[in-house]
Amino acid sequence: MFAQPYDHSFNDLFNQYVNMETSAADGKDSTLSDFDQLFPLDSLSSDCGDLPPTVSTPNCHQSPQPWSNEWSLQNDGPAVDHFAFHDTVPLSAISDVNLNNFEVLSRPTATHALSTSPSTPPATPRRKPTQSALITPKSIRHRCPNERRSHLCKQSFSPSLMRSSNLSKARMAYPEAWAQQIQSFSLQSSEDRLPLSPPPSDVLIQHENRPAEQIMHQTRDSVEMPSQYDARLYHQPPSVSMPSPNIAMSARQPQHYIAHPSSSTLTNSSPSSADDMFSSSHSSDPHSLSSWQSDHLHPPSFSFTPDLQCQDSQWWSPMTSRVAQQQASYLTSPTPVRTMQSVGSQNDIMQGGLMIQFNPSYDMPADHSFSSNNMLPVAPQKFDTSFTTSQVHNVSRSPSLSPKAGTSPRDTHNGSISKPVHRRTHSRKLSGQSMNAPKPAKASGSSSRGSNKSVSVSFVNFTAHDSKKILTGVAPSGSSKTKARREQEARDRRRKLSEAALRAVRSAGGDVEALEAVLC
């Protein structure tokens, strides 16, 4: 009787349960087995006719609502009754056949059935307390003495179960749909917040002096996003926009100044490449001429020198881009350009908001954010900077910086390295000259004897007490064995030289004894 196919109404199930209680008085074990087969512990329903085992409602995925709002869904019709039945009946309550628990489960639908079908009784008859319950691990429900206490226990248990399941569902459901909704929302809010033209120089300086925490707080206040997506990917204040030209696209389109303007809506959703960040500040092309004034470019602010020959997009970490955002005020674009980007490329680049650092050889020729098909140039607008109309036209012809402004950081960088080296060598030479200043006098005194030895001692680091050792041909450094060997070689050399001199004097017919008396 109870195992007949499930009718699509919880009220019919309720009526069958009441009729079963009145008619079947001695079939308790079979009733329990049928009830267990109808509602297994693994899933809510697998044998319940045409009702699908898992029913997902759009109301459950929005946000976890209070327990009273879940009961208010009962007024929507019998279809909502199925959903409320599947969402609100916990497994532990179904596994136990205690009448008090099941009575609490059927109470909201019973009150609803009173308004729709008057034949439904308001409450189920009470079963004898001697009935044996189906005991399963972690699903034992104790009997409550009165009905009100059981109702309170049920209300304290079910909302936490529902909220935990709904939180897990809402957290894992449809990440691509989340990304599309966030992107469409960022389109609307960025149009309202970001200006079309770059802000004036005093505003840029004021924004630049602000700490990074205030910038991130302002970004977080502009759009509320889930925690797995970084807010800096979608919205950046005007002070941290990335307006810098691209080398590869400037060669294709010499008539437009290709940049990251402040009015771009989707460009900041992908991490900026290394060439897009630094190509304008380190462009070493001799043919590129521009009328940029070097007063707006402070050379100490540029500290990165990437590879200028690499034209494909290189991905940097967010910390490097944050360092590069400090120079964004000096790279303001005079001609703002709006760039559009497809949703698929954004999802591919973003990689779920994890900011995965790609390989430097990773390129996207089809969905590149600077492709010529997506460029929509906007007419140049006047703003309070030092640019005039003629300078704007000149800049649009040559998108890179002037060689003077571009090479000034390198000149200062090279000069800061070369000048200390020059000072070191000069001071070393001065110290060497001061130490070996008394050497030429002594060397000239003994030049007749060992003139060839004075040439071979130019590499030695001189000290105040090395003059005798150096003149004897022994270097002041080395181990004890090396010093002994060199001293022995010096003595042999002096002895040979003296013997050769004596032979020369004797062969010339001179007096050797008189010469030794004069020299010694």
UniProtKB/Swiss-Prot annotation:
Residues 420-429 have a biased composition (Basic residues). It comes from the Eukaryota. InterPro entries: WetA. Residues 261-294, 436-453 have a biased composition (Low complexity). BrlA, abaA and wetA are pivotal regulators of conidiophore development and conidium maturation. They act individually and together to regulate their own expression and that of numerous other sporulation-specific genes. Plays a crucial role in pigmentation and conidial cell wall integrity. Belongs to the wetA family. This is Developmental regulatory protein wetA.
